[in-house]
Structures are given as structure tokens and as C-alpha cells.
Amino acid sequence: MSKVYDWFEERLEIQSIADDITSKYVPPHVNIFYCLGGITFTCFLVQVATGFAMTFYYRPTVAEAFASVQYIMTEVNFGWLIRSIHRWSASMMVLMMILHVFRVYLTGGFKKPRESTWISGVIMAVCTVSFGVTGYSLPWDQIGYWAVKIVTGVPEAIPVVGGPLVELLRGGVGVGQATLTRFYSLHTFVLPLLTAVFMLAHFLMIRKQGISGPL
């Protein structure tokens, strides 16, 4: 085992990277509330893992979506547990994200020179809410259907561009298969990719600038 480690160490200098990570200075004012962002990140990882597991059985069609969710809950081994963890972790992620935003705002973590970190965090907050909106529709039950119909109908009040924007979201005039396909694509590919990119940028900026000082 040591030979394998030495092989990687010689080429990648793993030890120096580990030393840099573990020796990072942590200010004395940091408390448990500074862990809220990390908890949100953990919830995101749980969402990715459980969501990926469900994609093996979920069918994004208006005719089969609801039945496939029922199949996951009743027939797939531990499917009920995986979907329940996905749902609970989603609620926890939203809650921790909100608390994290409040903590950063109340402690002034958005001020110079951390404006970019704050902006990337706000974008991720929007992505998190969008996860909830798109994921809510995927079972394609009565609640999901009418939620999509209401949410996608909101932009219609915008002058000039409202109508085309609604059609873009729905994939047509009414809510149907094209809408479900769009929401499934957003929920399983577009939003996770955007969130991962902005998370990486967020962490790199925190790493570079350090944790903000006390008020």
C-alpha cells in the first residue's frame, strides 16, 4: 500500500496538498453557525446520490411518471427509504441555505472584498429554490400538475414577453409532456451542473479570502 501512495506522492505531491488543507487558519470567533454552509453542501451531495439512484426507475412521461414513483416506493428495494431521504434532505437543504444566508448577512460576510462570494451564494440560493419547484412536479400527481400550471403561469403578467416566456417554460400553450420533460431536464442536469460550478467557485473564493471577521 505504501508503494502505491509513494507513486502518487511522487507525481502529485499529495502530502503538501493535505498539509495546506489541514493547516488553514480558523479564526477564534468561528462557531457552530459557520457550519451551516457545509451542512447545505452535505445535503446537496445526499440529493445527488439519492436522485441519481431514482433515475434508474423514474420515467419522465405524463403517462408513466406517477406509476414509476409508486413503483419506487413499493417495489424497489429500499426505494421508499431513498425517496424519503431525498425529500427530507431537500427540506433540510432549503432550511440550512436560508439560515446560512441570514448568518452571512448578519455577520457582514457579504462586504468587501467578498462581494463575489455573496453573489455566487445568491445564485446558488436561486438554484436551490428552483430545485424545489422542478422536483415538486416530477411525480406528476394532482399537486405537482397544478403547482407547475400556477408557477409557469406567473410570468404571463409580464408585459410583451410574458406570453412567450410562459410558452418557453411549458414547451407549448398548455402544461403537458413537453413541460415535464423540461422540468426533468432542469432538475436532473441543468440545475445540478450550475450548482456544482458555482459551489466550486464559492469554495475557491472562501479558500482564497478566508472566513470573514467578527462584527
Curated annotation (Swiss-Prot):
One of its GO terms (molecular function) is oxidoreductase activity. One of its GO terms (cellular component) is chloroplast thylakoid membrane. PROSITE patterns: CYTB_NTER. Heme c binds at C35. Heme b 1 binds at H100, H202. InterPro entries: Cyt_b/b6_N, Cyt_B6_PetB, Cytb/b6-like_sf, Cytochrome_b_N_euk/bac, Di-haem_cyt_TM. Its cofactor is heme b; heme c. It is a multi-pass membrane protein. Heme b 2 binds at H86, H187. Keywords: Chloroplast, Electron transport, Heme, Iron, Membrane, Metal-binding, Photosynthesis, Plastid, Thylakoid, Transmembrane, Transmembrane helix, Transport. The chain crosses the membrane at residues 32-52, 90-110, 116-136, 186-206. Component of the cytochrome b6-f complex, which mediates electron transfer between photosystem II (PSII) and photosystem I (PSI), cyclic electron flow around PSI, and state transitions. The 4 large subunits of the cytochrome b6-f complex are cytochrome b6, subunit IV (17 kDa polypeptide, PetD), cytochrome f and the Rieske protein, while the 4 small subunits are PetG, PetL, PetM and PetN. The complex functions as a dimer. This is Cytochrome b6. The gene is petB.
